[in-house]
């Protein structure tokens, strides 16, 4: 068979008040290389032992749910996306699994179908849509219907501060309230509306202001990520537009002017020595498939 490689970018979600809706693709990647057929699924990886190497692996289990008739293969998986750090590692695996099914099963899925299927698995469109489409996405899940709009944000730089500690998404969601007062919801959604409008009009200072005024989730998650306020203060002093939790955390996501991202990252690294400071870019391609050569490996 022609060697098949799938590359899926990481993602950050929420961007402050865009809870379960706004996502941005990032320049960290999951790679899947499909090798020969086998009598059973085998996943070759160098991750921790808890990551399955058989059909229970999230990539494979997703692929088999999308196309149950798939023939088992040996696949090799590598990734520089940190696990359980709020950078879309599970979303990237789901997206990779859908594409694996699409390619091996010759399903000819459209982009919209991929987004719909991925959202059904993930429960919200922000991470998966960003990984599929690249760039910045704004999505909505209304019952079973998914609507997604993609916009370009090439003038922005990205910095991620990644702690050593993991934070399970379920744990981070457990601190959120079950009920949100109506007047608070009005206030929070208005801030989110302005965030999206500012993203569309490239008003980056307004984007930075709005991403730091979330009411939906960050106030409840501060106890889990206590360094957020001090990182936010320093980043602003160093010239960043704005700072927010990356997804459910514990990583911190910072938007900067593109040309200042390296300088700001170096300044932050000198202050927050216990965290890994990554200077990233927004990925504008989304998922890519290469049938001729193994990309990125």
From Swiss-Prot:
Pfam families: GHMP_kinases_C, GHMP_kinases_N. One of its GO terms (cellular component) is cytoplasm. Its main location: cytoplasm. Gene3D superfamilies: 3.30.230.10, GHMP kinase, C-terminal domain. The keyword tRNA-binding does not apply. Keywords: Amino-acid biosynthesis, ATP-binding, Cytoplasm, Kinase, Nucleotide-binding, Threonine biosynthesis, Transferase. HAMAP family: Homoser_kinase (MF_00384). This is Homoserine kinase. It comes from Bacillus anthracis.
């Amino acid at each position: 068979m022609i060697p098949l490689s799938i590359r899926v970018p990481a993602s950050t979600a929420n961007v402050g008040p865009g809870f379960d809706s706004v996502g941005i693709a990032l320049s960290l990647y999951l790679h899947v290389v499909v090798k020969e057929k086998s009598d059973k699924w085998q996943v070759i990886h160098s991750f921790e032992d808890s990551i399955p190497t058989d059909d229970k692996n999230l990539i494979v289990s997703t692929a088999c749910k999308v196309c149950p008739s798939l023939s088992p293969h040996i696949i090799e998986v590598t990734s520089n996306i940190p696990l359980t750090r709020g950078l879309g590692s599970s979303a990237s695996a789901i997206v990779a699994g859908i594409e694996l099914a699409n390619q091996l099963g010759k399903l000819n899925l459209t982009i919209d179908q991929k987004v719909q299927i991925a959202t059904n698995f993930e429960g919200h469109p922000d991470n998966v849509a960003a990984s599929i489409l690249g760039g910045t996405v704004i999505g909505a899940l209304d019952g079973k219907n998914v609507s997604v709009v993609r916009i370009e944000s090439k003038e922005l730089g990205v910095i991620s501060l990644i702690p050593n500690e993991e934070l399970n998404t379920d744990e981070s969601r457990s601190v959120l309230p079950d009920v949100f007062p109506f007047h608070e919801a009005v206030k929070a959604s208005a801030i989110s509306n302005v965030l999206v409008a500012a993203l569309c009009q490239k008003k980056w200072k307004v984007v930075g202001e709005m991403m730091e005024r979330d009411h939906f989730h960050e106030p409840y998650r501060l106890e889990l990520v206590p360094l957020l306020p001090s990182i936010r203060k320093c980043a602003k002093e160093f010239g960043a537009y704005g700072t927010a939790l990356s997804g459910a955390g514990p990583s911190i996501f910072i938007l900067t002017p593109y040309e200042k991202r390296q300088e700001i990252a170096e300044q932050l690294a000198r202050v927050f020595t216990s965290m890994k400071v990554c200077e990233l870019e927004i990925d504008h391609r989304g998922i890519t498939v290469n049938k001729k050569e193994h990309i990125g490996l």
